[in-house]
Amino acid sequence: MNAKGIALVATLALMVVIALLVFGTFFTTQIELWTTRNDTTSVQAFYAAEAGLQKYKAALFQQYVWREQRGGTGGGGGCFTSLARGLDLDRDGTITPFVNNRLVLAQNEVVTDANGNPVGRYTATLYKDAQDDQLFTLVSEGTSGGAKARVQATFRISNSDYLEQAIFAGAGQANKWLNGGATIRGGVYVVGNPNDPDQYVIEANGNFALYNRYDLTTYSEVTNRVEPSYRQVQDLCASLRVQYGKISVGGSTQIGEPNNKVKGVFVGRGAQDITGENVGVCRNNKGVCTEAMGGFDLSDPPPFPTLDAKLDSDACSAYPTWRACLQGKAALRIQRIGNILSVASPPNATLSPSCLQAMQSGTLTLDTQSVDCTFTRLDGSRGGFRYTYTGGQELLEVFGDVVLEGIDAVLNRPVDYRAQSGSAKSATLAVLKLGGNGGNLDINGNLLPDATFGLFPNHALGFVAEGDIYQRGQHVMAPVYAGGTFRVVKGNVLFASVISNQFCTTSAGNQMSCNASQKAEVVYIRIPKENRPALLPSLRGGKPSGIPWGGARE
């Protein structure tokens, strides 16, 4: 048999992989003995090789999901997967590392037929790309008698979870969901509207750009707020995914660059949902500079997270809804019902009079008056939040997760923040609706981590607004969730991730419309999983996505 060069379709069936998790780590490989003419041993060698490929392809995805569920995966700012450091196939805590980007998974493993008779052996070897920690090649070499066969598959394995993107968006609005002069450095994921798959969720006819890199030296005002290893990343493993909807690429739009392509563009039903053509780059690929392009590729995609749906995250999986999780996990929870403010939890907390007075109107405005909403917990640690006005660079300290219900929040001045939950330098500040009131956040000045307390992303404060978030401050360094619209004024930059139903650029801070021609930016700085604000949206084990890059057999 000589089938060199024939493509092997490497279909990565994630639903099958998840099912395999229920029945154990590995499964016994068996094949039905198939003979053709007099070339039995050649056929058996090929099927031995194919058995090794399929077994360890499934095992790799099982390993990935298990590692993501365990946490502590680490990783830096660029392309990363928890498999990059090696594998723990026995799940005993001992990782077998790659040696020169090579790891032998099985040596002369026996393959039997349905009757238990040995028909061949295979050796399976995994190769990691030297430049890209998400790209792997699995090679399986089979033997039977004197015959030999070899099959291989190259694939990318990554996580499509909420905070693995620069922007994760919901249904958006009809027409021009993301357009004009916005610059996105990192991946974009749009759920879209299943009832309107012909809607354009991205109609990019201006200077819209989606890049796979960033260099914070071009943002000199914030460079010293970020860990040195995160200040410049040349490969973010960025992809563009649209579950329902179309994109249009025109004008001087850039999606990827010829010398730094995005990893994939996966839109709706495929090529028919990618229309238009931009000027001068990647002309043979509809003006899209990408390593792979096709229809939406996830079999079990993550939904847009909402407060009254269950959130299957590590922190919230035991709660019926994300709202209930926020309420139950909060170190401090304050409610405003009508004109009455109360501390919903913890019971018997003693707060400064300035705390509830600051929210009496229904809006907590952090401006020229200090506000102290801290208290001493039973273990002696501090809980709640405190805003200190100094007349220069103000300070917001958050101790544990804070939930404000029926209240809007406004940060009116440039603010440094300090976030702490136990030993972690992270926390979540949430504003939720109650009785039709509250749930919105305005950020009117710079909002950055206090570098004397810790550098981003190992020091991060997350924000949740059930309604809208409006960024008028030039630089905001925090992951944010807006159940409604995230608005950002032209010339402003958010560093981290945006999860919002709609992303909107505006021409000025008093505008509610989404202006197509305004240049604003989102720069994706990846937060290590172990330091992500625990109550922000996430999914246990992430959402693994496997992109087949091709295969061969011989």
Residue ranges and their predicted role:
Residues 170-179, 186, 192, 324-326, ...:
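Extracellular beta-sheet-rich ligand-binding/adhesion modules
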